[in-house]
Curated annotation (Swiss-Prot):
It is an enzyme of class 1 (oxidoreductase). Its cofactor is Fe cation. It holds the Pfam family FA_hydroxylase. This is Cholesterol 25-hydroxylase. The chain crosses the membrane at residues 38-58, 84-104, 124-144, 167-187, 190-210. GO terms for cellular component: endoplasmic reticulum membrane. It comes from the Eukaryota. Catalyzes the formation of 25-hydroxycholesterol from cholesterol, leading to repress cholesterol biosynthetic enzymes. Plays a key role in cell positioning and movement in lymphoid tissues: 25-hydroxycholesterol is an intermediate in biosynthesis of 7-alpha,25-dihydroxycholesterol (7-alpha,25-OHC), an oxysterol that acts as a ligand for the G protein-coupled receptor GPR183/EBI2, a chemotactic receptor for a number of lymphoid cells. Residues 128-263 form the Fatty acid hydroxylase domain. The keyword Lipid biosynthesis applies. It is a multi-pass membrane protein. It catalyses: cholesterol + AH2 + O2 = 25-hydroxycholesterol + A + H2O; cholesterol + NADPH + O2 + H(+) = 25-hydroxycholesterol + NADP(+) + H2O. The keyword Oxidoreductase applies. It comes from Rattus norvegicus (Rat).
Amino acid sequence: MACHNVSELQDLGCSNQLLLQPLWDSIRTGEASARSPFFPVIFSIFTYLGFCLPFVVLDVLCPWVPILRRYKIHPDFSPSVRQLLPCLGLTLYQHLVFVFPVTLMHWARSPALLPREAPELSQLLSHVLICLLLFDTEIFAWHLLHHKVPWLYRTFHKVHHQNSSSFALATQYMSVWELLSLTFFDVLNVAMLQCHPLTILVFHVVNIWLSVEDHSGYDFPWSTHRLVPFGWYGGVAHHDLHHSQFNCNFAPYFTHWDKMLGTLRCAPHSKRLCAGSESCLDSGEQCTVHLNQKKKQT
C-alpha cells in the first residue's frame, strides 16, 4: 500500500513537471542567448518598459478619454514629458552603469549549462510566493529604516519621493543605492531557495509587474489587490497613500507587516483592506483627514 502511494506521488510530480517542460524546452533552444552576460539586464529593462508602456499610453489618452479618469487615483493628474523623460533616462543609465556590472558578477558564478528538466509547477509557484514574501519583508525593513533615520532618507530614499503622484515610469526613479538594494534582495532570495532558472525568470517578471502596478496610478477592477482575498495585498491606492503621507504603508506588496507594526493606513480607494480591523479603519480615516488638511494648507 505504501509503495502504491509513493508511486502515485511520483506520477503526480512527473505530471506537474511535464506541464512546464514544453515551455522550458523552448527557452533552452535559445540557451546561448539566455546564458549571455547581457541577457539579465536586457531582460530586466525590456520587461520593465514593456509593463510601463500601457500605462504611459493611458496617461497620454486620459485627458481626452474621460472614462479613464474613473480608474485613476488622481483623476486630474497626468505626467508631463518633463517628468517622464528623466525617469526613463535614469532607469537606462543606472541599469547600464550599475546593474549590469552586478549581474555580470552573478553570471560568472552561475552554472555553465541550464538544467534539462523543468521544475514542477507546484515547486515553481511555491518558490515564487516565498520569494515575494521574503522580498516584501526585506523591503519593508529597509524602507522603514530609511524613513525613520533622516540621514538615510535624505541621502538615499528622497529621490524616489520627488514625485508625490504615482505614474508607471516613476517606479524605478530612485537612487543607485536603492536600486542596488532591490537587486541584491532579488538575487539573495532566489539563491537561498536554490530556485530553478525558470522559477527565477517567472519571479522577476511577477516582481517587476507588481512594482509597476503599484506605481501606475490606476486602480482597475482586475488590479492585484482586488484579486487577493482578505485584504492581504495592498495595491496601488495603498502605495500611493505612502507617497502622499510618507509615514505609512511601508511594505511594497502585502499588508501583514504594516498591520502588525501599526503603520497600515487605508486609502479611500481600498477600504476593503480595513475589513475586520477597526483600529486600521480608524487610522485610515485619520490619515485621510490629515491628507485633506495638508491639501488645504498648500
